């Protein structure tokens, strides 16, 4: 049987360098990679591509193949690769000032002021290193503030890999309980027993079930934790009125509403998805786009909740938190993102891609459609609407998506091989990039339509 890599070689791609590096890496790194999203079991079979370099909207692998890059590091490369303003700010800071001091700098407050000015729901903000940390702090803070224990989280969402939330990301439906009463399914072994007792798992986009759950359990619920746009089961938009209902229900019962904007923050607009959609959460977490390619995250929100951090009731600590490199990168990134017209131009290129892909698929009579908001989108090979994780499991054709990915890769267009990831667009992408992408898409769609 022909493997995916055989198909790439036949299409004129040489990836033997990646094959050799992967074999060597497997001898010293478990699975040959340092993140599950790059692993063979995440779709990179029989091995992931090994990168030589990136520049702007392009990425080059070790075998010299060049791609229009819509993977973008899974989201943080909002400006594309090696953006001059961010890179220069980091190099300048290292050369002139240092890296880690274990003491504050004036740059931290300047960054906090920019975040607060950009995101209306944030009165105060604390920095950290990763989205996982930011979510951990937000849920801990919500529990401390409300003096309650339970967290509502939604099937199909990813909020980092801490024990308290690494549940029901993509569970087997047979193990996940009935549609209207899901059970918590651990992402894998090693989770302490009893953690799931403080989790309430719900399907997304079901306002009535959320209302019924809060009516029944409200006095025990500390927080509702959600992405404002579902980004870890492909791209799924909130149904009209759903987030508004969530906000009203949580506010009425004194439940902290936490928006995980690790992916959407500073990507869907300077104020994130919450500003774009007009919803004001109590706490928010940010990462990815905040650093313009450098590792930095933040958690912020209402002043009365954040006061528990100010007085030491809830501890947030870390040697590398607010290190000079991360803060310099984030300050430069937010300055660049504040450029007048930047998001309008980014949305225009993104809309051209999204609408163009939809037209290509429609003209090929493929059972597929494109869902997205601004520079975030995914192709669903499905005939039924997908509103939550279980819809995706039941209706999305993963095999056709795989063939779509292979065909696009062979034609120099890169995105993640998993249908539950997304295509990301950067400010470096051009109308010419979109035209080349759509030309490749027409060829692949025609091949898929013939059943090849």
Walk through the language-model features, giving the residues of each.
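Conserved N-terminal phosphate-binding loop of PLP-dependent enzymes in the Aspartate aminotransferase
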Residues: 2-452
């Amino acid at each position: 049987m022909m493997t995916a890599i055989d198909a790439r070689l036949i299409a004129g791609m040489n990836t033997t360098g990646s094959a050799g590096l992967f074999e060597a890496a497997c001898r010293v790194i478990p699975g040959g990679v340092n993140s599950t999203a790059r692993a063979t079991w995440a779709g990179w079979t029989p091995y992931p591509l090994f990168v030589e370099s990136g520049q702007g909207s392009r990425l080059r692998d070790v075998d010299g193949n060049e791609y229009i890059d819509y993977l973008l590091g899974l989201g943080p490369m909002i400006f594309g690769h090696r953006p001059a303003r961010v890179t220069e700010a980091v190099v300048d800071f290292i050369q002139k000032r240092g890296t880690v001091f274990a003491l504050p700098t004036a740059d931290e407050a300047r960054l906090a002021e920019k975040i607060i000015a950009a995101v209306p729901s944030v009165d105060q903000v604390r920095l950290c290193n990763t989205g996982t940390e930011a979510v951990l702090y937000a849920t801990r803070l919500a529990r401390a503030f409300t003096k309650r224990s339970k967290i509502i989280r939604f099937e199909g969402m990813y909020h980092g890999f801490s024990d308290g939330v690494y549940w029901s990301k993509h569970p087997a439906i047979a193990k996940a309980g009935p549609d209207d009463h899901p059970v918590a399914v651990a992402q894998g072994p090693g989770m302490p027993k009893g953690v799931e007792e403080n989790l309430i798992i719900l399907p997304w986009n079901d306002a009535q079930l959320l209302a019924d759950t809060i009516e029944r359990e409200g006095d025990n619920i500390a927080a509702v934790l959600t992405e404002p746009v579902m980004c870890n089961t492909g791209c799924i938009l909130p149904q009209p009125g759903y987030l508004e209902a969530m906000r009203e229900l949580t506010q009425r019962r004194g439940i902290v509403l936490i928006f995980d904007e690790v992916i959407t923050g500073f990507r869907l607009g300077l104020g994130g998805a919450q500003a774009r959609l007009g919803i004001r959460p109590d706490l928010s977490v940010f990462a990815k786009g905040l650093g313009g390619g450098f590792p930095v995250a933040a958690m912020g929100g209402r002043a009365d909740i954040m006061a528990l951090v100010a007085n030491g009731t809830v501890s947030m600590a870390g040697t590398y938190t607010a290190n000079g490199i991360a803060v310099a990168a984030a300050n430069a990134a937010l300055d660049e993102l504040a450029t007048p017209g930047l998001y309008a131009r980014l949305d225009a290129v993104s809309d051209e891609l999204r609408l163009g892909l939809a037209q290509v698929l429609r003209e090929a009579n493929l059972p597929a459609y494109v869902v997205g908001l601004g520079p975030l989108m995914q192709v669903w090979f499905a005939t039924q609407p997908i509103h939550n994780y279980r819809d995706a499991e039941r209706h999305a054709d993963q095999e056709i998506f795989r063939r779509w990915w292979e065909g696009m890769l062979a034609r120099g267009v890169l995105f993640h091989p998993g249908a539950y990831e997304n295509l990301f667009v950067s400010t470096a992408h051009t109308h010419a990039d979109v035209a080349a992408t759509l030309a490749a898409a027409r060829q692949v769609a025609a091949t898929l339509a013939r059943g090849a």
